[in-house]
From Swiss-Prot:
It comes from Clostridium perfringens (strain ATCC 13124 / DSM 756 / JCM 1290 / NCIMB 6125 / NCTC 8237 / Type A). Catalyzes the condensation of carbamoyl phosphate and aspartate to form carbamoyl aspartate and inorganic phosphate, the committed step in the de novo pyrimidine nucleotide biosynthesis pathway. This is Aspartate carbamoyltransferase catalytic subunit. The gene is pyrB. One of its GO terms (biological process) is 'de novo' UMP biosynthetic process. It holds the Pfam family OTCace_N.
Length: 307
C-alpha cells in the first residue's frame, strides 16, 4: 500500500510499487473518464520555491483531472517565505489546509526536511541538483509504454550530468532493472557526481562509460536522454556561455542512431535539440510530457488511498 507514503527519492519505492503506479497510469490513459472524480474533495498544495512550468502545471492538471483542487504558490516572493517564515512552519501550516504536498526547492534535502514536519504525503518535485522522482516515474512510464521493456537497454545521457537532478534520479531508478548499460556524455566540467558513479554504478557492477562525444554515444544508444545546460546552476556566467551549446542534437546526428532509438528530454529545451528533430519518429519528448501528467495522477491517487 502506498497510502500516506512520501516520495522524496526514487529509492523510496520498490520496483513492485513502481509497477503498481505504472499499471494505474496505463488504465487512466486508456479510460480517463473512469477516474475523473476519484479525488473529489481532496486538495493538493503546490509549494514551488523555484520556477517551474511543466512540473507545476502537470501536477495541477493531474489533480484537477482527478476531481480534486489545488492551492499553493509558484514563487517564494508570493508567499510568507518572503517574510522570513521557516520551511518547518510553512509545512505545518499547509498541513492544516491540504491532503497532499508537491514541493520544489533549490536546496538539496529540502523535501526530506519537509517530510519530517508533515503528516500528509510530501512529493519531491525537485530539490536543487539532487533528485526529481516524479520526472523519473515519467521517464520510466514513457520507456515502458513505447519501448516495452525497462530492462536490457543502453541508455545514453547527454548534457549537464553534474547538476541535472533528472539524470541522477533516472540512473538510480534504471540501475535497479536488469542488464541496463549507461553511456554518460558530458563536458569534463559537468561529469556525473562521484556519489552516483561510486554508490550506484560501481557498487552495483553496472556497465557504464564516460565520454565527451555525442556522435560516438548515439551509435549504441537504445534511449538518448538529452538535457539542457542549466544557466541557474552556474555561478560564473561566462562558464555557462562557453558550455551551453556544446551538444546540439540535429538530423545529421540522428542519421548515426538506431532506427528504433528513443529520444527523451525532461524539458524545457533550449538549444540542445534542433526543432527539425521534432518531426523524427524517434522524438518522444512531448509524449513524455503527457505521460508525466498521467503518472502523477496515478501517484497522487495511490498516496491518497483513492485507487
Amino acid at each position: 500500500m502506498l497510502k500516506n507514503k512520501h516520495l522524496l527519492d526514487p529509492s523510496d519505492f520498490t520496483i513492485e510499487e513502481f509497477d503498481e503506479i505504472f499499471k494505474l497510469a496505463h488504465q487512466i490513459m486508456a479510460n480517463p473518464k473512469e477516474y475523473q472524480n476519484i479525488c473529489n474533495g481532496k486538495i493538493l498544495a503546490t509549494l514551488f520555491y523555484e520556477p517551474s512550468t511543466r512540473t507545476r502545471l502537470s501536477f495541477e492538471s493531474a489533480m484537477l483531472r482527478l476531481g480534486g483542487q489545488v492551492i499553493g504558490f509558484s514563487e517564494p516572493n508570493s508567499s510568507s517565505v518572503s517574510k522570513g517564515e521557516s520551511l518547518r512552519d510553512t509545512i505545518k501550516t499547509v498541513n492544516c489546509y491540504a491532503d497532499l504536498i508537491a514541493m520544489r526547492h533549490p536546496l538539496e534535502g529540502a523535501a526530506k526536511v519537509a517530510s519530517m514536519y508533515s503528516d500528509i504525503p510530501v512529493i519531491n518535485a525537485g530539490d536543487g541538483g539532487h533528485q526529481h522522482p516524479t520526472q523519473t516515474l515519467t521517464d520510466l512510464l514513457t520507456i515502458k509504454e513505447y519501448k516495452g521493456n525497462l530492462e536490457g537497454n543502453t541508455i545514453a545521457l547527454c548534457g549537464d550530468l553534474k547538476f541535472g537532478r533528472t539524470v541522477h534520479s533516472l540512473i538510480k531508478a534504471l540501475s535497479r532493472y536488469k542488464n541496463n548499460k549507461f553511456i554518460l556524455i558530458s563536458p569534463i566540467e559537468l561529469r556525473i557526481p562521484n556519489y552516483i558513479r561510486e554508490q550506484i554504478l560501481e557498487k552495483n557492477n553496472i556497465e557504464y562509460k564516460e565520454i565527451t562525444s555525442l556522435e560516438e554515444g548515439i551509435k549504441e544508444a537504445d534511449i538518448l536522454y538529452m538535457t539542457r545546460i542549466q544557466r541557474e546552476r552556474f555561478v560564473d556566467q561566462s562558464e555557462y556561455e562557453r558550455l551551453k551549446d556544446v551538444y546540439v542534437l540535429d538530423e545529421a546526428k540522428m542519421k548515426g542512431a538506431k532506427e528504433d532509438m528513443m529520444v527523451l528530454h525532461p524539458l524545457p529545451r533550449v538549444n540542445e535539440i534542433a526543432y527539425e528533430v521534432d518531426e523524427d519518429s524517434r522524438a518522444f519528448y512531448f509524449k513524455q510530457a503527457k505521460c508525466g501528467m498521467y503518472v502523477r495522477m496515478a501517484l497522487m491517487a495511490k498516496l491518497l488511498g483513492e485507487a
